[in-house]
């Protein structure tokens, strides 16, 4: 008799958002300006998030979608009630650093910001929802960028430590699952968002990125140390933008190219989960003339304070080639990939690969042997509501169901340890990559368009009831 495939009874089902993509209220109650506020929609967006073009304030002629976003700051009770109706066990959200320390380098926090998140966490618990909190999700106070150069500056360790100490102390008993940095490997692809970096002409960009990465890695270790000291119940995770790099062919040079691309991603988690810099990275820095300044104390912190679990986003797999003539690209999560002829793609060119999620789960488990948490997964699509705001999003249901099956197989047939799953953008929000509203992920439709027009009214999509059933049956409803 075949054993029925199931999820653990303790499995944490839920959804995920980020402060800068949903809260809005960019200047409410003492909040300071952050890098994510000044990234406009349109053709300059990519140059700004990659640090090639400087924009440190709002400028005429641009639309900044994060200023209002979906106004969750004023509507969180309504939104969390909807999450509760779906039966969420967990809700992943992030803290806007500049709500807590408006400039980032103050000695005392902003009480209004602390109170907002306290109220939000209490609202979650009212519905039996466990908060999963990202300390920084592409979020850096602009003052820290203008005054100190963002994460290139070692002083950021002090400011981040103060933020963490404040959060862990204030929310002790309210939050026990923490992520230190969202998609930490994005520093290599979107350095202004990932680390508040802007580059000067002629500067060695890779040198700056890896120095900033070192500071973030040490900051993550400091956060892990503090979290465990302040509350031994705390669980701290790292967070990676994941997705396996398949070789374009079985030619050894393509296999090698895929391995090299994977190493660029896993480099960060190698440090956070294993506690030391991998030899391949040291050798690469040597070859490329990159000198990362670090102290013995840094190395000790990294070694002694590794993460409790590994979390990641998964949207698509990627393809790599060692042949420079192979160059048919397709879009992905900020960074592009070679096209995979065996896969279908979303409207934005992201390749749909549920088996790739199972492969990624196994790769991460084999590499680290630490519990995992899938904290982003979903399908960005154009949704067309009827006159009542209802969207029959069967395409989203199909995408998510296929990925739920892949998780279930990885748990039951491969033996990976997976704590939970939060779909990305459980309510429609502003896209981090493009700044669009029309690229929707949610179970809940929000009446707002790319120009900021709309009532912000919330309405349930077909996928709302589907996911409610998935959670109620602990995944058994997905056949």
Each predicted region: which residue ranges?
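Catalytic domains of carbohydrate-active enzymes, especially glycoside hydrolases
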Residues: 71, 75-96, 304-310
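Glycine-rich, proline-tolerant flexible connector loops at the mouths of alpha/beta enzymes
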Residues: 95-109
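Active-site region of glycoside hydrolase catalytic domains
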Residues: 2-60, 85, 103-105, 114-479
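Active-site mouth loops of central-metabolism enzymes
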Residues: 61-75, 152-154
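Short, flexible active-site loop motifs that bind/organize anionic cofactors or intermediates
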Residues: 66, 73, 104-107, 347
């Amino acid at each position: 008799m075949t054993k029925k495939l199931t999820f653990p009874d303790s499995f944490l089902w839920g959804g995920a958002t980020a402060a800068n993509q949903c809260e809005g209220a960019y200047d409410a109650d003492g909040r300071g300006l952050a890098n994510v506020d000044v990234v406009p929609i349109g053709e300059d967006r990519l140059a700004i998030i990659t640090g090639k073009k400087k924009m440190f304030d709002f400028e005429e002629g641009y639309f900044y979608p994060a200023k209002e976003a979906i106004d969750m700051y004023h509507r969180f009770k309504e939104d969390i009630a909807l999450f509760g109706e779906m039966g969420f066990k967990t809700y992943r959200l992030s803290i806007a650093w500049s709500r807590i320390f408006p400039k980032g380098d103050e000695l005392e926090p902003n009480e209004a910001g602390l109170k907002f998140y306290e109220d939000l966490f209490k609202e979650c618990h009212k519905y039996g929802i466990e908060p999963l909190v990202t300390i920084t999700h592409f979020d850096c106070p602009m003052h820290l960028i203008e005054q100190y150069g963002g994460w290139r500056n070692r002083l950021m360790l002090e400011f981040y430590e103060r933020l963490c100490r404040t959060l862990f102390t204030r929310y002790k008993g309210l939050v026990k699952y923490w992520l230190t940095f969202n998609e930490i490997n994005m520093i290599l692809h979107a350095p202004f968002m990932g680390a508040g970096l802007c580059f000067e002409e002629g500067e060695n960009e890779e040198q700056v990125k890896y120095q900033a990465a070192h500071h973030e890695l040490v900051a993550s270790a400091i956060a892990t140390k503090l979290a465990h000291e302040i509350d031994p119940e705390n669980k701290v995770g790292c967070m990676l933008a994941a997705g396996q790099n398949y070789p374009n062919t079985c030619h050894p040079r393509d296999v090698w190219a895929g391995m090299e691309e994977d190493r660029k991603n896993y480099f960060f988690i190698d440090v956070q989960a294993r506690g030391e810099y991998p030899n391949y990275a040291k050798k690469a820095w040597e070859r490329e003339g990159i000198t990362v300044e670090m102290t013995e104390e840094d190395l000790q912190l990294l070694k002694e304070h590794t993460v409790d679990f590994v979390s990641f986003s998964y949207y698509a797999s990627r393809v790599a080639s060692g042949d420079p003539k192979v160059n048919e690209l397709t879009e992905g999560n900020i960074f592009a990939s070679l096209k995979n002829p065996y896969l279908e793609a979303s409207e934005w060119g992201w390749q749909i690969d549920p088996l790739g999620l199972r492969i990624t789960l196994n790769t991460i488990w084999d590499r680290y042997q630490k519990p995992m948490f899938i904290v982003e997964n979903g399908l960005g699509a154009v949704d067309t509501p009827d006159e009542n705001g209802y969207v029959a999003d069967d395409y989203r249901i199909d995408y998510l169901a296929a990925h739920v099956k892949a998780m279930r197989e990885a748990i039951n047939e491969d033996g990976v340890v997976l704590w939970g799953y939060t779909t990305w953008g459980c309510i429609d929000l502003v896209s981090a990559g493009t700044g669009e509203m029309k690229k929707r992920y949610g179970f809940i439709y929000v009446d707002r368009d790319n120009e900021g027009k709309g009532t912000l009214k919330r309405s349930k999509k077909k996928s709302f009831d589907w996911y409610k059933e998935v959670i109620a049956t602990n995944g058994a409803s997905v056949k």
